[in-house]
Amino acid sequence: MIKSKFIVIEGLEGSGKTNAISKIVNLLNKQGIKNVIFTREPGGTPLAESLRTLIKEGVGYEKITDNAELLMIYAARIQLVESVIKPALENGSWVVGDRHDLSSLAYQGGGRKIDTKILKMLREVFLRDFYPDLTFYLDIPPIMGLARIRARATVRAQIRDKVNKIKRNHSHDIKNALDRIEVEPISFFDRTRKKYKELASKNEKIITIDASKSLELVNKEIKHQLLKWLKKQI
């Protein structure tokens, strides 16, 4: 019996994390690993979900500073790790997470250009030697990922208006359907992706998946890599 593990899925907006998580949980179940819980960052606990709303939506017209954003993300992360993830692992459950601290290194370190020393200090103080056992990084060009996000936002607006029997142009609704991270300029996501790729290339526990390929090929590669990794854990 394989000891409980913490598997994380990382990637830019529109990279297909939701699909990957579903695929991984399904594959684990087929391998006889039934006790699997799902978490997401920021979020996963009542407090962390409240922080997620603040991070994603902000408060009125007040600008959230980069450092304030980072600290809110870390507060949510610490709450999730200490109250959900660690207890689950100790009780024998596997945990599949939508993002972990690699996101902070990429988004806040790369995208926001926050000093890496600050990010490392936060990890060392609060997470210490707690790391995911395996991370899948879904790599996708920002322009492709954002196109997927905007397409989904358009569909949601169309469905909503169909239900409410409203006819209108949805060009103005798309931006309103995106959160404060998703409306960042393409240069922000270029920097974030560059940092992701840099970090992934230096860590053997991070597997890079080309998420620009078809869903079928992405799922096939995830299956191949996950099963190969599981064999090494026996």
Swiss-Prot record:
Report the EC number(s), separated by commas if there are several.
Answer: 2.7.4.9
- Could you tell me one molecular function GO term of this UniProt entry? ATP binding
The cross-references to Pfam families, in alphabetical order and at most eight, read: Thymidylate_kin (PF02223)
User: At which positions is ATP bound?
Assistant: 11-18
Q: What class of enzyme is it?
A: transferase
Concerning CDD domains, the annotation shows: TMPK
One cellular-component annotation, GO:
cytosol
Keywords of this entry:
ATP-binding, Kinase, Nucleotide biosynthesis, Nucleotide-binding, Transferase
Keyword hit for Transferase? yes
- Lineage, top-rank taxon, reads Bacteria
Under catalytic activity, the entry for this protein gives:
dTMP + ATP = dTDP + ADP
The reply on keyword Transferase is yes
Q: Which InterPro entries match?
A: P-loop_NTPase, Thymidylate_kin-like_dom, Thymidylate_kin_CS, Thymidylate_kinase
Output one GO BP term.
Answer: dUDP biosynthetic process
Q: Where are the transmembrane segments?
A: none
Could you tell me what this protein does? Phosphorylation of dTMP to form dTDP in both de novo and salvage pathways of dTTP synthesis.
Q: Which family does it belong to?
A: Belongs to the thymidylate kinase family.
Q: Under what name is this protein listed?
A: Thymidylate kinase
This protein's gene is called: tmk
